[in-house]
């Protein structure tokens, strides 16, 4: 008995021929048609068919969601129903709850052809099979997951060979990986023009398929130990050009790793500077309170000695001005800068070649030595511009020197006979002239950049607005003056404002502004109105933005950096002179340049007889 009925047999129940069926018929569920049931079976079509598809009612088998006995005949028409399982996202049922499985019945398995229609739910990921098994990304045959391919990195021993081809059954052996790669591209991959193009990789059952020949040839580099693409900065090599391009971004200055490392280093340096400044500010405040505001009070000897060893500026020279201490703020800063400059000069002049060598190392010049001739080509040098990064970098050199030599700035000045440092300095014997020229050019450019920044900062400090007198002083006018308000006595210009004076009047008296005079364009000596809140907010915003620029740098720090760079330039110049002098000594001492006395006399005679003598008449 078979349930494989033609779908058209459900359209007209009257014309169905008698057919044996199961015990549960469909007469009650499909009663809208004109047909009748014959026993427990189904009716088949007669020879004459009269179909009216437009007149089919909603209760017909075509529109019913499922028959009352859940027979498989309704599975073909359930998709067009309003309540079909496909629209509800449910799986179709082929058997009722009370029925037994057809496969478990006594009938032969070959007499049944059960339709197994699989409908997936929209929100479901798994797939339900007729047998009840569920699979999720696994192989349905054996249930095993396809193993992930792992490619081993190429080592040095892999480059020694021999190199065997593992493409299917090919067993050709080559001496070099280049020959193996050419063999794979020409013989196994082929070309479209030769009608033998293969876009699937059969190396050890890799089975990777591409859409272009360039893609499969690029993929073959994974299997072949060939790295023809070399990095210009580091000794690494790569198989594909895109790998080299990706790697080259590591050496860029704006790489996230480099930026993060530089930011962390700057943060540590700033934290160290803050701790150092905080300690000394606290000690200086105690020292000021004890010596200036309360002169009778004296510190204990141990505390005073401890402060003298830690303070960066000697304040003992300022004790003569303790009476008018509040009246001389500029004198205090000038003396501090002067004393600090003396200490810095001692610090740099005491034969300190370690700092110069450290600066050359950190700027990737490697001691200007020929020990590593390709070292400069493998490092990316920074630009010789005095910006924020360069400011912090030079500050770190000075901080490291202070931390390693904390008491050297208190030492006395060396004697004058030891001043020429180039006579006592020892330079390396093997010097790379190319690195020497590059270093000299770099630090000269950096010195010029520091000079420009120093001039800009010094100009800002020089033209700082000074507090001036609010009201102009009115001069005493003599009674014998006939000119009254408009004249002046003794050639001295007036010090009060005059609105109607001509513009060129002040040109005859350029000193009028120096004696408290008022400009020609000032109409009154009354104070101007206070600035509005908006102007104040604008000024605060501009001031906060200026703090972010390099103008916030201290002038003494810029001078310190200038002196450091000048010391490096002097070191390089002395090294260059020493090298030239040594070469001259070597050339003079060589036997090729030695002449005998007779040869020298002959040369002198030739030089003397070069021009003819003019006889006097």
Swiss-Prot record:
A zinc finger (C2H2-type) spans 163-188, 199-223, 229-251. One of its GO terms (biological process) is positive regulation of transcription by RNA polymerase II. Activated by C-terminal proteolytic cleavage by signaling protease (probably palB/RIM13) at neutral to alkaline ambient pH. It is found in: Cytoplasm; Nucleus. SMART domains: ZnF_C2H2. Residues 1-91, 242-307, 405-427 are annotated as: Disordered. InterPro entries: pacC/RIM101 (IPR050806), Znf_C2H2_sf (IPR036236), Znf_C2H2_type (IPR013087). It comes from the Eukaryota. Residues 63-84, 289-307, 409-426 have a biased composition (Low complexity). Residues 242-256, 265-288 have a biased composition (Basic and acidic residues). Keywords: Activator, Cytoplasm, DNA-binding, Metal-binding, Nucleus, Repeat, Repressor, Transcription, Transcription regulation, Zinc, Zinc-finger. GO terms for cellular component: cytoplasm; nucleus. A motif (YPX[LI] motif) lies at residues 471-474, 611-614. Its main location: cytoplasm. GO terms for molecular function: DNA binding; zinc ion binding. The keyword Isomerase does not apply. The keyword Cytoplasm applies. Gene3D superfamilies: Classic Zinc Finger. Transcription factor that mediates regulation of both acid- and alkaline-expressed genes in response to ambient pH. At alkaline ambient pH, activates transcription of alkaline-expressed genes (including RIM101 itself) and represses transcription of acid-expressed genes. Binds to DNA. Interacts with RIM20, which binds to the two YPX[LI] motifs and is required for proteolytic processing. Belongs to the pacC/RIM101 family. This is pH-response transcription factor pacC/RIM101. It comes from Debaryomyces hansenii (strain ATCC 36239 / CBS 767 / BCRC 21394 / JCM 1990 / NBRC 0083 / IGC 2968). The gene is RIM101.
